[in-house]
């Protein structure tokens, strides 16, 4: 379990890794973590966090932003490189909602999604939750 990250003699794995499994309570090696670099867990955690919590989802010809965050998150920024362009996405949450988009601006213009920009360009996206 993550609570044992500070007990390397028990965990026997680096605290920054997602291990494939942690030995259960009924085993004599309870708490020992195994196969830290032979798992897809970290990739799936990144995918879930960026695309479904922060809500930045690329598609074939556009990208959308639809966050689902704790109500006490008042703002966050995501810098996302996609197809050679840099997308600077700033999300504000003035009403403390957990989901929903009240306004969406791409480079200062109202929009409902982010079009693909040329490689090397920078795109500014402002999202207000509500």
Annotate each predicted stretch with a short phrase.
Residues 1-130:
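Non-catalytic C-terminal accessory modules of carbohydrate-active enzymes
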């Amino acid at each position: 379990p993550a609570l044992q990250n500070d007990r390397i003699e028990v965990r026997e794995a680096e605290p920054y890794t997602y291990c494939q499994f942690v030995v259960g309570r009924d085993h004599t090696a309870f708490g020992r973590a195994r196969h830290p670099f032979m798992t897809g867990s970290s990739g799936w955690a990144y995918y879930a966090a960026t695309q479904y919590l922060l809500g930045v989802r690329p598609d074939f010809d556009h990208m959308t932003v639809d966050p689902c965050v704790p109500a006490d998150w008042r703002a966050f920024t995501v810098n996302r490189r996609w197809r050679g362009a840099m997308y600077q996405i700033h999300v504000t949450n003035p009403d403390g909602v957990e989901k929903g988009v009240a306004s969406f601006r791409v480079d200062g213009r109202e929009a409902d999604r982010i079009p693909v920009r040329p490689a090397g360009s920078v795109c500014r996206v402002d999202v207000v939750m509500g």
